[in-house]
Amino acid sequence: MKPEVAILRLEDLCARSEQCTSDLQRKLSNWGISKSDSEKIISHLIDNRFVDNNRYARAYVRDKYRFSGWGRQKIIAGLYSKRIDKSIIEEALSEINLKEYASIAFRAIASKLRQLPDELSRADKRQRLIRFAASRGFEIALIIKILDSDRLWHSSTT
C-alpha cells in the first residue's frame, strides 16, 4: 500500500473512532509501510489532531469502567499494552468518578454472588468473589470493603 493511501485510510479510521499511536503503527506495519514513512504518517495524524493518546486514554478509561465494568488494574494493564505513557494513564484514571466506580464494583460482585450455588459456605463464596473481582481489575481494598458490607449479603437474597 502506498503511504498516501494509508494516510487517507487512517484519517478515515481516526475520524470514526479514537485510536492510539501504537495501534496505528501496528496497522501501518501490517500494511507493509516502511518505518520512516510510518513515523511521518503518525506525525501527520498527530499534527492534524486525528490521533491523540491523551484523548484516547480518557475515552478508553471511561468506556472500560462504565460499559465493560472493568476495575482500575485491568484498565491500567490495557493501556500499558497499548504503550500509553504512565503520566497519561494516571491523568485519565483521575477522571473516574469514585462513587460510580464503587457502585459498578458492587453491582458486579452482587451479580456474581447471585450466580453462586447456595450450598457454598460464605467463606467459599468470599474466595470466589475476591478472585472474580480481582480478575475484573478491582483493587483488593475495595473488594474487601464491599464483601464486608452487610448490604451485599442481604441484596443477594432478594
Kindly give the residue locations of the regions a language model identified.
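An alpha-helical, amphipathic repeat domain used for nucleic-acid recognition
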Residues: 1-158
